[in-house]
Amino acid sequence: MKVIKRIFVLLLLVALLAISYGVWVLYGSTTSNPHNYRCLGDIPTPYGYQRIMGDDPDFSVFLRSLPLKGKGAEVELFTGGTARFQSLNYAVVNLPLLSNAEQCADVCMRLRAEYLYNKGLCGSIHFKDVNGKTIRYQGGSSRKAFERYLRNLYGVASTFSLSRELKQRRLADIQPGDVFVYAAVDRPGPHKYGHAVMVVDVARNPRTGKKAFLLAEGNTPARNIHVMRNLENPFRSPWFMLDEDAEGLILSVFPYKANELRHF
């Protein structure tokens, strides 16, 4: 009788755990910044993983210091209202949009430019437009001039120009600050738009050598920069696990080829 009672209690506990997990997947796992992290670097790595600095440690530190909006914050559109598919958002970056043209590639350029501007390297801020012409920032330390430069840049640059300007990187060498990017012209078929997302953090398991990474993106129409949620992870973690030998990756809902990883 005691054995039957123990089995019953065990089955009851398993059922309660299953129900709790189901409720969490349906509700808790879609909550933005569920643990109220203050900045991107507060997001814990997968168990056994350690953050890496990459070839540009200062850029890695800058990205990890990006402030996050509080628990439950929604991705808002520049024009007002909230974006669709909020479940794709793991955490909203607390950085006000500059214009309705600040979309996917623009976000990648902005984060790079913000890093250089905040580091006092204003002379290093330059990007190419869709015709291959270099657009240089020449406004010095003026924040107003810097933001005006970015607004103008958004109108002449795109996923096409960014994919041509950045240098290719092997998946195995992925680092913070890298960009997954493709232009519509590179994809025959129904693809009307290109897309770009930035790798904002990378962690490595020293025992296995495996890597995981965080992504941040903007999108069309212009919306808050946000850390992407990995929908393939059963716990809805924002970390994407890297398969170095993969020919392609599905990052949230966007497909990328292995050779579409780039770096500044």
Question: Where are each of the predicted segments found?
Answer:
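Low-complexity, Gly/Ser/Thr/Pro-rich intrinsically disordered linker/tail segments
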Residues: 212-264
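N-terminal hydrophobic targeting/anchoring segments and the immediately downstream early-domain regions
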Residues: 86-90
